[in-house]
From Swiss-Prot:
Belongs to the TRIM/RBCC family. Residues 382-412 form a coiled coil. Zn(2+) binds at residues 290, 293, 313, 318. GO terms for molecular function: zinc ion binding. PROSITE patterns: COS (PS51262), FN3 (PS50853), ZF_BBOX (PS50119), ZF_RING_1 (PS00518), ZF_RING_2 (PS50089). A zinc finger (B box-type) spans 235-280, 285-326. A zinc finger (RING-type) spans 146-192. Residues 603-701 form the Fibronectin type-III domain. SMART domains: BBOX (SM00336), FN3 (SM00060), RING (SM00184). This is Tripartite motif-containing protein 42. Residues 434-492 form the COS domain.
Length: 723
């Protein structure tokens, strides 16, 4: 570190320009040339608010204030943003809040205390390690922050329950933990599980290196300065020379960090041309140190317990377990992670459709509700009008019936009364005739009187039985029955799809299309019963593999692994997978997860080469497995040969059949040579489609091995096109 000189007056030290009262570390960070050092640590701890006024979006922390006179680049103008940053952030220094600094022609004029905040550039509550300025749409930050303090931390440690906490929160838990003899019981704040940890001031928990790397990358992209002040990251020293110079390269073969002089002195021999060199990284060195045996390095992975192992851990705790090398473990976990991502993308497609459907349904509720209310109102108004019309008609019928009935009764009473009066007179006349003593006079009129009485009896009619009924009984109205009929016409409520209260919504179907790659090692000199066909050919020999229309993964539909959802009459539809699938049967095929009809059996679909690991004289290729049944794989690899004048042709190096694994390792390759690989699957119905051409270049003897873990670009593009 060079001598701290004042930027305003280089001829004097910064203490002469700045009063002793304001000789804080922040002022030193501004007024001295130490501001140009990117590894200068922050003068305050993480939990304090003072980070001064650094321009956090600068690639180098040289712009320290809103005034660009502090920047090394006078053309900065507070726009010294990196390509990945979107905004320019400043942080307020709480220790200099009452200081007013004025300048005149680039020289320090005075430093006056004031009751006002002179350096108030940003919010006083802004923390450089709190993700407050992050966009709300960022879902990654929730997995990077500590769940207790909700801050971004470069170093977090994993509990046995797989929850990660920062060191500060772990120390707080340790203070309040219950101590039992030489152990303290640590309770996870996330899942409330108890863990027995040794009572010590050292941290006996593995560090979550993946979260640390992702957090550092996140800070670099979003303008956080905390990653620059990481005290744990220091220079890597040479492990060979005594002067302990800074290491320049690391030899993977020798497992040593070498400076430039030692590299030339000990690795310039021809015998060491196959050694692999990589750049030195403190993160890689710390990650491979066993937490239980600091003197040993991690070199294997236990499949049984899913743990990283060193040589001592394997002998002591994992003897007899299924262990693999780190390279093969990375390959398997990469394939498993890719398969899990593919499964979720298939489920996410259905989830997005469901969410979109419900969002549309939710937004249409208000408009549909008003329309429905209007429809119900108009309907009941019509019903009321009909009832009122019926009431009017019935009332008129009752009135008319009463009037007509009264007329008929009056007519009957009048006619019958007249007839009765007439007959009463005739009867009185007949009674007087019976009193006559003269026979001639009686006999002269007796017959006539009898005939008149009988005729009068015959002409006297009985009343109509309908006249005896009451007028209200003529119009029968059972209002109780009408009310019940009306209630039955209207529905009581919406019908549910599942009437049983015990039934629960089923999960989304999982479309499993990938298998975890298994360990296998092949070489061109140890294939056993397998056949290798050697021949020369040009690019025309595999023109079908370059046919983009045939080889594109998007041209192949997803296998129908389950029946479509059954439609129901209700609002909700659930996936019914019961009875659709069968347990896997034991067979020699790779893939027998789903039951297919005989008509659906076909040749294997396309596969994807998702990972390659290339050495100077060897290469290892990993590929996925299609959804159809597979008996074996077949590979062809070509070498690109350059012939004068600048002509490039392909030469078939080998054709390998009956491969029973999802990876293949080839040896005896030529360094600094370009190779092309393609793979296809074979079953009883014949060979499937060739995969896309995978091009690799073997490095020279002094280069580093080239490997890509995780998803390759062709996997990502195929995944995006497919989903």
């Amino acid at each position: 570190m060079e001598t701290a000189m004042c930027v305003c007056s280089p001829c004097c030290t910064w203490q002469r320009c700045c009063p002793r009262l304001f000789s804080c570390l922040c002022c030193k960070f501004i007024f001295t040339s130490e501001r140009n050092c990117t590894c200068f640590p922050c003068p305050y701890k993480d939990e304090r608010n003072c980070q001064f006024c650094h321009c956090t979006c600068a690639e180098n922390p040289n712009c320290h204030w809103c005034c660009c006179s502090w920047a090394n680049d006078p053309n900065c103008k507070c726009c010294c943003t990196a390509s990945t940053n979107l905004k320019c952030y400043y942080y307020e220094s709480h220790c200099c809040r009452n200081v007013t600094i004025t300048f005149r022609k680039g020289r320090l004029r005075s430093i006056v205390t004031s009751s006002k905040t002179a350096l108030r550039v940003g919010s006083s509550d802004t923390q450089m390690d709190e993700p407050k300025t992050m966009p709300a749409s960022s879902h990654l930050v929730s997995h990077l922050t500590c769940p207790m303090c909700n801050r971004l931390r470069l170093h977090s440690f994993m509990l046995p329950c797989n929850h990660s906490l920062c060191e500060k929160c772990l120390r707080q838990l340790q203070k309040h933990a219950e101590v039992t003899e030489n152990f303290f019981i640590l309770i996870c704040p996330m899942c409330s599980r108890s863990h027995c940890m040794p009572y010590s001031h050292q941290m006996h928990l593995p560090e979550n290196y993946l979260r640390g790397r992702l957090t550092k990358r996140y800070m670099q992209q979003h303008g956080y300065l905390k990653w620059r002040f990481d005290r744990s990251s220091g220079p890597i020293l040479c492990q060979v020379c005594r002067t302990r110079r800074i290491a320049y390269k690391r030899c993977v073969t020798c497992r040593l960090n070498l400076c430039n002089d030692c590299l030339k002195a000990f690795h310039s021999d021809v015998a060491m041309q196959d050694h692999v060199f990589v750049d030195t990284s403190a993160e890689d060195q710390d990650e491979k140190i066993c937490i239980h045996h600091p003197s040993s390095r991690i070199n294997e992975y236990c499949r049984s317990d899913n743990q990283l192992l060193c040589a001592f851990c394997k002998i002591a705790f994992h003897n007899g377990h299924d262990t693999v090398s780190l390279i093969d473990a990375c390959s398997e976990r990469s394939a498993a992670l890719f398969s899990a991502i593919a499964k979720f993308k298939a489920v996410r497609y259905e989830i997005d459709n469901d969410l979109m459907e419900f969002n549309i349904l939710k937004s249409s509720f208000k408009a549909d509700k008003e329309a429905k209310r209007k429809e119900v109102r108009n309907g009941f108004l019509k019903l009321r009008a009909i009832l009122q019309e019926k009431e009017k008609i019935i009332m008129e019928q009752i009135e008319n019936l009463e009037v007509s009935r009264q007329k008929e009764i009056e007519k009957y009473v009048y006619i019958t009364t007249m007839k009765v009066n007439e007959m009463d007179g005739l009867i009185a006349y007949s009674k007087e005739a019976l009193k006559e003593t003269g026979q001639v006079a009686f006999l002269q009129s007796a017959k006539i009187l009898v005939d008149q009485i009988e005729e009068g009896i015959q002409n006297t009619f009985r009343p109509d039985p309908q006249l005896r009924l009451h007028s209200l009984h003529c119009i029968p109205l059972d209002f109780a029955e009408l009310s019940n009929a009306i209630h039955e016409l209207f529905p009581t409520g919406p019908k549910k799809a599942c009437s049983s209260g015990d039934s629960l919504p089923s999960q989304y179907p999982i479309h499993s299309e990938m298998m975890i790659a298994r360990k296998v090692t092949f070489s061109t000199h140890s294939f056993g019963n397998q056949q290798i066909y050697q021949r020369s050919s040009s690019l025309i020999s595999f023109n079908t593999a370059n046919d983009k229309g045939k080889m594109g993964l998007e041209n192949y539909g997803r296998a129908q692994s389950a029946a479509p959802a059954k439609t129901t009459d209700g609002l909700y539809t659930y996936w019914s997978a019961t009875g659709e699938t069968q347990p896997p049967q034991s067979s020699n095929s790779f893939h027998n997860w789903y039951s297919f009809n005989d008509t659906s059996v076909r040749t294997p679909g396309p596969i994807v080469i998702y990972q390659t690991l290339v050495y100077p004289r060897a290469a290892k290729v990993y590929w996925t497995c299609p959804t159809e049944d597979v008996d074996s794989f077949e590979m062809e690899f070509y070498e690109l040969v350059t012939t004068p004048p600048n002509n490039v042709r392909t030469e078939l190096c080998g054709q390998i059949r009956d491969i029973l694994q999802q990876n293949l390792e080839l040896h005896n390759l030529t360094p600094n040579t370009e190779y092309l690989f393609k793979v296809r699957a074979i079953n009883d119905n014949g060979p499937g489609q060739w995969s896309d051409i995978c091009k690799v270049v073997t490095p020279d003897g002094r280069g580093k091995n080239r490997a890509k873990w995780g998803l390759l670009k062709n996997i990502q593009s195929a995944l995006q096109k497919r989903f």
